[in-house]
Amino acid sequence: MNITINPMESLVSKPNTSNSIILTNLNDFSNWARLSSLWPLLYGTSCCFIEFASLIGSRFDFDRYGLVPRSSPRQADLIITAGTVTMKMAPSLIRLYEQMPEPKYVIAMGACTITGGMFSTDSYSTVRGVDKLIPVDIYLPGCPPKPEAIIDAVIKLRKKVAQETYKDQKRSIRGNRFFTLKHQFDFVPSIHTGQYTQQLHDKSLSK
């Protein structure tokens, strides 16, 4: 006795209908098509991008997730920022993001992209987090993150795309951008010479 188990049997409208007919809606079909063919724009400025470049090799093979790197933002629906972002680069990054068609997604990769990293403590030109410029969907911490972590971030983004509705795709997200050139912090001398510590000690004595 041969028993055939069809995993798609619950999606068929009637038991007597052909198994090639599957019920779905336009929203689910659109989400399935988009999550199966993400086209990323690689915005690498530092050492984190080297870890992402290792995904292209045969060991990790990111082609199985439908990722097709693009060199033009008009053909991409995902931008991966990897590395330090400076104030001079901020307008270019925003311009690339605005040229991407909707719906679009952002993965912030590495500590320098998320918080500014080690360059944020004593630098006047480093952006303290790329989310001050463009809205971020997935945060990927690490210095640098491993290729396995990058794959996990892509999987989480695919799950987010699968749960979206058609109204979410059309909703404008430009209001989430907080780009400003006025960082609220004080300029102090270099902390590596020891003079900064001496100045704090003198101020405490004067009080």
Curated annotation (Swiss-Prot):
A Pfam family annotated for this UniProt entry: Oxidored_q6
Record: residues binding [4Fe-4S] cluster: C47, C48, C112, C143
Keyword terms, alphabetized: 4Fe-4S, Chloroplast, Iron, Iron-sulfur, Membrane, Metal-binding, NAD, NADP, Plastid, Plastoquinone, Quinone, Thylakoid, Translocase, Transport
Cofactors that this protein relies on: [4Fe-4S] cluster
Note describing how the cofactor binds: Binds 1 [4Fe-4S] cluster.
One GO term of the biological process aspect: photosynthesis, light reaction
A GO molecular-function annotation: 4 iron, 4 sulfur cluster binding
Top enzyme category: translocase
Top-level taxon of the source organism: Eukaryota
Location relative to the cell: Plastid, Chloroplast thylakoid membrane
One GO cellular component, as annotated: respiratory chain complex I
The reaction(s) this protein catalyses: a plastoquinone + NADH + (n+1) H(+)(in) = a plastoquinol + NAD(+) + n H(+)(out); a plastoquinone + NADPH + (n+1) H(+)(in) = a plastoquinol + NADP(+) + n H(+)(out)
Enzyme Commission (EC) number: 7.1.1.-
Membrane topology reported for the UniProt record: Peripheral membrane protein
Gene3D superfamilies: 3.40.50.12280
Function text: NDH shuttles electrons from NAD(P)H:plastoquinone, via FMN and iron-sulfur (Fe-S) centers, to quinones in the photosynthetic chain and possibly in a chloroplast respiratory chain. The immediate electron acceptor for the enzyme in this species is believed to be plastoquinone. Couples the redox reaction to proton translocation, and thus conserves the redox energy in a proton gradient.
Assembly behavior: NDH is composed of at least 16 different subunits, 5 of which are encoded in the nucleus.
Protein family membership: Belongs to the complex I 20 kDa subunit family.
Stored PANTHER family: NADH DEHYDROGENASE, NADH DEHYDROGENASE [UBIQUINONE] IRON-SULFUR PROTEIN 7, MITOCHONDRIAL
Name this polypeptide is given: NAD(P)H-quinone oxidoreductase subunit K, chloroplastic
Native source organism of the sequence: Psilotum nudum (Whisk fern)
